[in-house]
Curated annotation (Swiss-Prot):
DNA-binding among keywords: yes
EC number(s) given by UniProt: 2.7.7.6
Protein name according to UniProt: DNA-directed RNA polymerase subunit Rpo1C
One GO process term, biological-process aspect: DNA-templated transcription
Organism in which the protein naturally occurs: Thermococcus celer
Assembly behavior: Part of the RNA polymerase complex.
Length: 393
């Protein structure tokens, strides 16, 4: 059996990154206790690890961008183009497949189906009633959500809302609270509550169109919950037995402050919101996770390193940039590369007007003018010392 100190010294000498060294050391200690390894066996394991690590490295001059584009693009052609219901929950729609991939790499400001996955703290996660309490705090509820029927009375210049008692109870509200909330928000109208009926009368009698506009505002007015968040759905995780809340709509900054929510695990599928709240590194991880998850849902396998390269390029400058003419490709230094991508004539005219010079450092511009591309063997230039002829006397 080899001493732990000896194993540590042997691992430290190996040409490996620190994180792999740590993992290798832990494994060797574990196997050493179990199988009582000899020094030669420990060295053989280290040598094999170094060999495998070197095999995994990219060759200098490899066209990694092209390989990543092919590796992500080819499986993407097999994806479906639909919006599906979320994990068997019919109430919430989620964008999957190719539209979701496009949405991520385009760095859209408003995703088509923003969703938050809200995890709960120790006190709330295993009790459905307590999970329901947290869901009520999150779920955005407006008068429209509670209404059974709405009517505009033109003769009396009134807007009448019939409230559904069941929905009212489910939302954890009462009629007095609704009246107080509306009165504090709309000073230009009077509100009367009669049983489960809310009657709104504008203080000034004007045009019917102004009553309609005011009625629309009152209907949409948020009575409780977070802004930009619609309904919530509680599901139970079959593996852990804990309750998880999924929301239609996203307000990541505010949901982290809600009592009962576990802020360390709660997440949203809105990448820009993650960057705003948690920073660019978290957004980079979210891009990788979202693309991987979308691929896996379709049963497609892509090496994570291709996706990491895309995420690195998108977040390189500390802000999220789309891949396309409004982002990375559109900001390329080469005029010819930009012209080869989209809106060719405009790029060429603008470059001619400025008297721009193309250094021809990239792949696209060299292909365009028929030169060898600076990839692989094209990245190196040979320098030779030729034998000099002796001078004639």
């Amino acid at each position: 059996m080899v001493a732990a100190k000896t194993i540590k010294g042997m691992v430290d000498k190996a040409e490996l990154p620190d994180n792999i060294k740590e993992e290798l050391y832990a494994k060797l200690i574990e196997y050493n206790k179990k199988y009582k390894l000899k020094k030669a066996e420990v060295q053989a394991i280290i040598d094999e690890t170094v060999k495998e690590y070197q095999k995994a490295l990219i060759e200098p001059g490899e066209a990694i961008g092209t390989v990543a584009a092919q590796s992500i693009g080819e499986p993407s052609t097999q994806m479906t183009l639909n919006t599906f219901h979320y994990a068997g929950v019919a109430e919430i729609n989620v964008t999957l497949g190719l539209p979701r991939i496009i949405e991520i790499v385009d760095a859209r400001k408003n995703p088509s189906t923003p969703i938050m996955t809200v995890y709960l703290d120790e006190e709330h996660r295993y009790d459905r009633e307590k999970a329901l309490e947290v869901a009520r705090r999150i779920e955005g509820t407006s008068l429209e959500n509670l209404a059974r029927e709405t009517t505009i009375d033109i003769l009396n210049f009134e807007f009448i809302v019939e409230i559904d008692p069941e929905r009212l109870e489910k939302a954890g509200l009462d009629m007095e609270r609704i009246q107080r909330k509306l009165e504090s928000s709309f000073k230009s109208a009077e509100f009367e509550v009669d049983g489960y009926t809310v009657i709104m009368r504008p203080k000034k009698v004007g045009k019917i169109s102004s009553l309609r506009r005011l009625a629309e505002k009152v209907k949409k007015h948020r009575l409780k919950g977070l802004s930009r968040v619609g309904k919530t759905v509680i599901t139970k995780d079959s593996k852990t037995g804990e309750y998880i809340i999924r929301t239609e709509g996203s307000n990541f900054k505010q949901v982290l402050k809600v009592p009962g929510v576990d802020p360390t695990r709660t997440r949203t599928n809105d990448i820009r919101e993650i960057a705003e709240v948690l920073g660019i590194e978290a957004a980079r991880n979210a891009i990788i996770d979202e693309i991987l998850k979308t691929m896996e849902e379709q049963g497609l396998e892509v090496d994570v390193r291709h996706i990491m390269l895309v995420a690195d390029m998108m977040t390189l400058d500390g802000v999220i940039r789309p891949i396309g003419r409004h982002g990375i490709v559109g900001e390329k230094a080469s005029v010819l590369a930009r012209a080869a991508f989209e809106i060719t004539t405009q790029h060429l005219f603008e470059a001619a007007e400025r008297g721009a010079v193309d250094p021809l450092n990239g792949v696209v511009e060299n292909v365009l003018i028929g030169q060898p591309v600076p990839v692989g063997t094209g990245t190196v230039k040979l320098a030779m010392n030729l034998p000099l002829r002796p001078k004639r006397e």
